[in-house]
Each structure stands twice: as C-alpha cells, then as structure tokens.
Amino acid sequence: MSWYSFGNDRSLLILKLYVQPGARQTEAVGICGEELKIKLAALPVDGKANRALTEFLAKRFNVPRKNITLKRGEQSRHKVVEVCQSSNGPEVLFSEMRAE
C-alpha cells in the first residue's frame, strides 16, 4: 500500500496523511508507515488545523480549496483527503524538502 492512490479516471488523487498540528511551520516532512506526515503550524482548535491542511494542499496542488475534501479523520491525526482536478501529482508535496 502507498500513501496515495488515484481514482478511476486519474482526476482524483487520494492521500493518506498523518498530521501533526502545532508545529513551527507547515510542511510535508516524509513518509511515516503508509501515510505522508505533514506538520501544521495551526493548532487543532475550532477546525483551524483542518483548514490549514486544506489550504496547504490547495496551494501545493494549485487548485481551489473547494477541490480538497477531507474524507476521513476530521478530529484525528490520521486523515484521508481527496484532491480533485489537479494537474500536479503527489510529488509536489516534496518540492520544499528537495530544495533544502
């Protein structure tokens, strides 16, 4: 199993994420088991961490935030997220990691 998969027509990207809220900055940090670990600067209060996650993913995948759907894990660190209509693949989440 992988931390990502594609829907039938490849216009849907499904991500399995492990999210760590309350970090110094928002960034993808690497693979943790079968999930991609993402650190979020936002705290898990009043949905702020989920909003920060969807904003981060929308920016990385160059899609509107409405194209990012949290399918599972609204109140968990383990999340399943769908990205619709992105021309970018999952490798865009690692762009900052390679630059360092």
From Swiss-Prot:
The lineage of its organism: Bacteria, Pseudomonadati, Pseudomonadota, Betaproteobacteria, Nitrosomonadales. HAMAP family: UPF0235. SMART domains: DUF167 (SM01152). Belongs to the UPF0235 family. Disulfide bonds: none annotated. One of its GO terms (cellular component) is cytoplasm. Pfam families: DUF167 (PF02594). This is UPF0235 protein NE0395. It comes from the Bacteria. PANTHER family: UPF0235 PROTEIN C15ORF40.
